[in-house]
């Protein structure tokens, strides 16, 4: 309806017709405004949007309301580093996808969530921290003196 072209998949597997299952699907999008390129799909769907420059690719990736995860694939390690730092996503995979560790924090940005699950960051977010300073000196010192 919006001009996207299904390159493969896009249908239910016959043997799984009783559920909400779809074959892995690749959609070629004429621009970044196709819904499948702008919403968070929790299914095997890849929306492909063509770009000419690195800057345009970053702009396309960041031009949506979501930012759970992203992936950058390139033989140029410096480009991978540069682009991954520019993407507005809670997780960025470089030359891999879905490497997950329970020790690492997990979470998105924008409408994909606030805060982190797993790892130290998740524990830290649940704590109420307080700083307490104690002086063992019997002499009352100037409270406005920086030590």
Residue ranges of each PLM-predicted region?
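Short intrinsically disordered, low-complexity coil segments enriched in acidic
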Residues: 1-4, 134
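Short secondary-structure junctions
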Residues: 3-12
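Conserved C-terminal structural/oligomerization subdomain of aldehyde/semialdehyde dehydrogenase
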Residues: 12-14, 21-147
């Amino acid at each position: 309806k919006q001009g996207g072209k299904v390159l493969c998949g896009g249908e239910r597997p016959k043997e799984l017709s009783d559920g909400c299952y779809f074959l892995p699907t690749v959609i070629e999008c004429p621009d970044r405004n196709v819904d499948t390129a702008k919403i968070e799909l929790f299914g095997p769907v890849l929306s492909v949007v063509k770009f000419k420059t690195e800057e345009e690719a970053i702009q396309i990736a960041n031009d949506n309301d979501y930012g759970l995860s992203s992936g950058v694939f390139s033989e140029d390690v410096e480009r991978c580093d540069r682009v991954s730092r520019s993407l507005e996503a809670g997780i960025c995979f470089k030359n891999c996808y879905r490497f997950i560790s329970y020790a690492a924090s997990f979470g998105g940005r924008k409408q994909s969530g606030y805060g982190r699950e797993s790892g130290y960051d998740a524990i830290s977010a649940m704590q109420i921290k307080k700083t307490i300073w104690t002086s063992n000196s019997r002499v009352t010192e100037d409270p406005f003196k920086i030590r």
